[in-house]
Regions:
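Low-complexity repeat regions of mature extracellularly deployed or surface/particle-associated proteins
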Residues: 1-219
Length: 219
């Protein structure tokens, strides 16, 4: 789906296996030749996928893309979901239920909210935040490996990250604040059986970190 304009509502539903859903809001052309000529302000983009081995991605392009709401819901195994949003005051959410699923959100803009929720066995969540005053939420619950990666860079001041990994299986969290991303806040909770591993690095100033690891396994 390729569309443009202010106040747009897009809803897609896909059922089956080995399918691809692509949503472009505000993109003037697929070859990017008209990227800066259209807007997608105040848009609501909702994608629902049921099945296995599917790919779903939603994307806006830089310029005139504020106040958007992106929601992707996936039920099934071996699925890959991506949201690529730009500009300010946007909210993006990916919810995945099933096994061996991957989710990735990236955004460049201020005052944004990024959320990934994963329930099942073996999953990976990745969020890139390239703006200020934004909130990152990742919740992973179930069995198998829990893997999460959060990057704040560059000029990502006053960003907060709340990361929860619960259940049986190994838990691995990587959270980074690079130069130009001051005043960061992290709360990380890892709970349940399996190894608890956290790799946290701040290449910046003024940050608060809270890490809680509960369970009978290595931490």
């Amino acid at each position: 789906i390729q569309t443009k304009g202010t106040g747009t509502t897009i809803t897609t539903k896909q059922a089956g296996s080995s399918n691809v859903t692509g949503i472009y809001c505000g993109l003037g052309s697929f070859d990017n030749s008209l990227v800066n000529t259209h807007n997608c302000d105040n848009a609501t983009i909702t994608a629902t996928v049921t099945g296995n081995s599917n790919i779903v991605y939603s994307q806006s392009v830089w310029s005139n893309h504020g106040d958007q709401t992106w929601i992707t819901t996936v039920n099934g195994n071996d699925n890959y979901a991506v949201i690529d949003m730009d500009e300010d005051d946007n909210t993006s959410t990916i919810i995945q239920t099933g096994d061996d699923n991957d989710a990735w959100i990236l955004g460049s803009g201020d005052d944004n909210v990024y959320k990934i929720e994963q329930l099942g066995d073996d999953y990976y969540a990745k969020i890139y935040a390239f703006g200020d005053d934004s909130d990152v939420w990742i919740t992973q619950e179930g069995t198998g490996d829990h893997n999460a990666y959060v990057l704040n860079y560059p000029n990502a001041d006053n960003n907060s990250t709340r990361l929860i990994q619960k259940g049986s299986g190994n838990k691995d969290a990587d959270v980074f604040w690079y130069s130009g991303s001051d005043d960061g806040d992290l709360t990380l909770t890892q709970q349940g059986n399996g190894a608890h591993t956290s790799n946290i690095k701040f290449y910046t100033d003024d940050y608060d970190v809270t890490v809680v690891q509960k369970g009978s396994s290595n931490k």
